[in-house]
Amino acid sequence: MEDADFMTEIFNGADIVYVMETLGAGSFFDQNLDVVAAITRIGEVYKQAIQRSGVKRVVHLSSVGAHMDNGSGLLAFHHNLENILNELPKDVSIKFMRPVGFYTNLFAFIPMIKTQGAIVSSYGGDEKKPWVSPLDIAAVIAEEIEKPFEGRKIRYIASDEVSSNEMAAILGEAIGKPDLKWLVIPDEQILKGMIASGMNPQTAKGMVDINTSQRGTELYKDYNRNKPVLGNVKLSDFAKEFAKAFDK
């Protein structure tokens, strides 16, 4: 994804390209890596490859929070990527897909539940937030690929809206721990734990800032103005998958 010549060759002759960004395993623990800058550079490569190859239809996997120019932590690279792709000529039609938080991110809580008997984060409470299944993301992208392309379009993708406390109850019931709680601790405590685990301090701060943004109103402001029809995979459905992973 970092080689413009290679990506141009891949894109040549394509009717539609679907682009997303990722870094290698262990990137968050690379002490010399600026994650936001590295992924932003991938966006520049995509832009060059799209221009050189002559592709006119693009689907880009972005994220909730991409409308924010600051205050979103590591999600800032999604804002940067959308801006970069929006620099393409107007005859290039782009669909920006903005999913919300992935259910699959919840797998990271399994070791914590096993050792501490609770989900611990720096956000939580009874306010409902949107979550999404990768299956619903795939379904929406497949749908958008089949639809006409014209100009620039943003579409949010979500499967369910639940509060952190509701989530703890649903997941707890699924794993046989009906008293499972979602506990909230200070950002500073989360940050210290991430750094102690070996994470790049800048990256850790970016992760914590995502949590901080979830406690405010700005992260979901544009989502709430443009709410999508919710997908088919509810948290109760994902809880079955979570329970299987928990039992391994």
Report the location of each language-model feature.
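Residue-level signal for the nucleotide or nucleotide-sugar donor/cofactor binding architecture
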Residues: 2, 132, 162, 230-233
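Soluble or luminal CAZymes and related metallo-dependent hydrolases
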Residues: 38-42, 77, 230, 234
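NAD(P)H-binding glycine-rich loop region in Rossmannoid oxidoreductase-like domains
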Residues: 1-52
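A hydrophobic C-terminal alpha-helical subdomain
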Residues: 174, 187-248
